[in-house]
């Protein structure tokens, strides 16, 4: 175990954790002085709740009957403590990075807080990530452990784990929730655990966890969120959304996402003694039943899912009646869709424009419909510093479009172990270049107008075109390729692979089968495959994606489409 500082805490922000960029000392001091940072560690969100509301229901699974199942705050606290002792006994030590990849369920909460209590740094993988992404996360973070389910949504995670262990010698511990196969059983590990001594508290300025980016310029990057900044993120979001102990929050997006985790999400609900219900199935039929069963009052969706829910109200026998607040974010919600959502699901729509890297913008409860339907909100915190600049880095005029740059008390100062990316993604003053094009209205609300980076926004997920193109070009049947986003009624954008075949063509099903075997996550694979005789280029020889999109509007060549689930 690392030596403790004089106050009993583990090492200070850099803590020997190479690759972490801490907040500059002057800004950190100002955030503490202003009261944004409380000096709490993230695991105290649970311990404080267990002390204040021990008997209140903390978490439940969507299928649980009210009054049966779930865990009280005291029970969740005890399980996290026992599991932390088990992890320590296994050999996981403070500062270790552990890949956490569990589906939505109470076990996610137990595992998250157990890792925090053990002093480990969870790497928040999503259930849809596969070997390519997990291997990248393991390599960048030098992870020593992996926590997965045995099987979820029809996918067996154990063969993937075997592949990862073979390729990454630092992955010494694989813990499986369910049938462990050749690995360690979570249930047996915890059953055999003693009480153990708690890990010394972490420095609040050090990383509490690593979120994953949308992969806008290649493989997803790792986002260090400190204890100080993430406690503020969750607490301030809960206050802005007026969460109370009477609320029931439905975790319907993947729980490892920043949005349902801390905006206010699971963690924000805990700060006020509310209940979080985990829903593994976001379909309207399953989600509406969970909302009815548990009296859900708050949830968060991406636009594609919000539109599907709203449309489903026309035929589903059970529709949401208890929702007081529906957050929609992840990509832009168009005004006509916002009106439809407010009419069909709840008038309490809240648009959220944020990023796992930090900055959050919300429309406010009580904002007029025009603001809620036509803008993506304004910053969470008075200390959020925003710059909107043109292509030359110069500030734009009032109401003009430009790229959004930001820094503040909960925005990162650098991706983890990504020096080259950080040189490109931050300006000399430490402002993060978001890649989002926005304009700021006179009332302070932002309107998102597009992206600077070459990305596709599919169902709330950001996919780097360059990363997919690299995978496409690895197929021997493909001579050249371009990935473009095409408008889609339900997904926002669908992924289209425009390719020139080297010889005999392949089908979309064959291509996606190949990408699956390469470990490419399902949500990043093409929805549409278009064969072209040649890819159009600009005068300087670059592939002209705007021309591709224009041509696809009148394409009559062979086109094969298939939804990617």
Curated annotation (Swiss-Prot):
Induction: Induced by iron starvation conditions. Transcriptionally repressed by IdeR and iron.
Record InterPro entries: AMP-bd_C, AMP-bd_C_sf, AMP-dep_synth/lig_dom, ANL_N_sf, ATP-dep_AMP-bd_enzyme
Keyword S-adenosyl-L-methionine among UniProt keywords: no
Disulphide bond pairs: none
An example molecular function term from Gene Ontology annotations: nucleotidyltransferase activity
Inhibition and activation profile: Inhibited by salicyl-AMS, an acyl-AMP analog. Also inhibited by 5'-O-[(N-acyl)sulfamoyl]adenosines.
Binding residues annotated for ATP, in chain numbering: 214, 330, 352, 436, 451, 542
Alphabetical keyword list: ATP-binding, Ligase, Nucleotide-binding, Transferase
One GO term of the biological process aspect: cellular response to iron ion starvation
Record-linked Pfam families: AMP-binding, AMP-binding_C
EC number per UniProt: 6.2.1.-, 2.7.7.-
PANTHER family per UniProt: LONG-CHAIN-FATTY-ACID--COA LIGASE (PTHR43767), NONRIBOSOMAL PEPTIDE SYNTHASE PES1 (EUROFUNG)-RELATED (PTHR43767:SF1)
Protein name: Salicyl-AMP ligase / salicyl-S-ArCP synthetase
Gene encoding the protein: mbtA
